[in-house]
A protein has these predicted regions:
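Terminal and linker regions of secretory-pathway proteins
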Residues: 1-359
């Protein structure tokens, strides 16, 4: 497995508030964390290899991995070793963490936060359980600080049923569009319940085409835009096509299809009710958690970007080991659309000793 580790220039040694490490997991499946997450979103250099002003390296060390194997520069000599499930991917990642952390006492002192985007959230939830089990068994020497899921594909049924009402609310759909989208979502739900994950994935593709045809091609990465419009960063508009589509290895479209339609909510339940102090960014209603009532009754806190900026950038709500963030004015790639407030968010999640927005 190919990985890239950045040690932050801002790293400080403080036993009472240890410096965090972020493991970034990209989506897809098949998106390169080393390529996309690193250069297009949060790494120290942008796509033009210019310094990124609001890199997450300000708040934590960064560890990017091309996962699962077959993605980016990660490969196998025997195609029979390519993973076919999220659990197998988590096993590979846990093995990698053992190789990186078990022999490095310095890294062992830093809490590891698994931060994921899109389909990476399914990997993150499963990896969180796998890593926790390895830690408790004495096989993995690291501190698991938390798991953060960003707009993650963890419950396909919930997401596809949300598309129609959302697009109707923002006037991208009329009643006919809403009805058609809901009909396809119901078909996906039936196929998932019957274990027909490949069929469900194909119907999901039909739903995407339906959305494009009936919304005048809304941007799937940001419903505030047309698909032809550029993202906040013009370069990023083309990156998903280059890194998330064209470089898919052949196993992505065949061997991982069953996992794409499956839910990760059992793994979330294990994490939420586990003994570790982790901070998930989303909890579906069907995940059992003994703090849910208190969380729902707590108030939201507004987020701003700097003391002198009066514009509301989002909200967050927290209770016990759950932190939930709403980021305004952002699409699927939050660090790109709202880099300032996302940097504040990740600093809070990881309890970074660096309270500044610079090195």
């Amino acid at each position: 497995m190919f990985w890239w580790y950045y040690r932050s220039p801002a790293r400080v040694v403080d036993p009472s508030n240890p410096w965090p490490i972020i493991l970034w997991l990209q989506g897809g499946p098949g998106g390169s964390g080393v390529g996309f997450g690193n250069f297009a979103e949060i790494g120290p250099l942008d796509l033009n290899l210019k310094p990124r002003n609001l890199t997450w390296l300000i708040k934590a060390d960064l560890l990017f991995v091309d996962s699962p194997v077959g993605t980016g520069f990660s490969y196998v000599d025997d195609e029979n070793l390519l993973v076919t499930t999220d659990e197998e991917s988590a096993t590979d990642l846990t093995t990698l963490l053992k190789a990186i952390f078990n022999g490095n006492e310095t890294l062992q002192k830093s809490p590891l936060f698994i931060v994921a985007e899109s389909y990476g959230g399914k990997f993150a939830a499963t990896l969180g359980v796998s890593a926790l089990n390895a830690i408790e068994a004495g096989e993995l020497k690291l501190q698991l600080g938390g798991v953060a899921l960003g707009d993650s594909w963890i419950s396909p049924e919930d997401f596809v049923f949300s598309w129609g009402p959302l697009l109707k609310d923002v006037s991208r759909f009329d009643n006919n569009g809403l009805s058609g989208a809901n009909s396809l979502a119901q078909q996906i739900q039936r196929q998932i319940q019957e274990g027909k994950y490949v069929d469900a994935t194909n119907t999901w593709g039909e739903l995407e085409n339906f959305v494009l045809d009936n919304s005048n091609e809304v941007d799937f990465y940001n419903f505030l835009l047309d698909s032809s419009q550029e993202s906040t960063d013009p370069e990023v508009n083309q990156v998903p096509k280059r890194l998330l589509l064209e470089v898919y290895s052949k196993f992505i479209s065949s061997k991982m299809f069953p996992s794409k339609g499956a839910s990760s909510t059992p793994d979330l339940g294990t994490l939420m009710n586990g003994p570790i102090r982790q901070k998930l960014k989303i909890i579906p209603s069907n995940v059992t958690w003994d703090g849910l009532k208190g969380y729902l009754e707590s108030s939201r806190t507004p987020l701003y970007c700097g003391q002198d900026d009066p514009i509301t950038k989002g909200f967050f709500r927290s209770y016990k080991n759950l932190f939930f963030y709403w980021i305004l004015g952002a699409g699927h790639f939050v660090p790109v659309d709202q880099p300032c407030v996302s940097l504040q968010m990740v600093g809070s999640i990881t309890r970074s000793p660096n309270t500044n927005s610079t090195f």
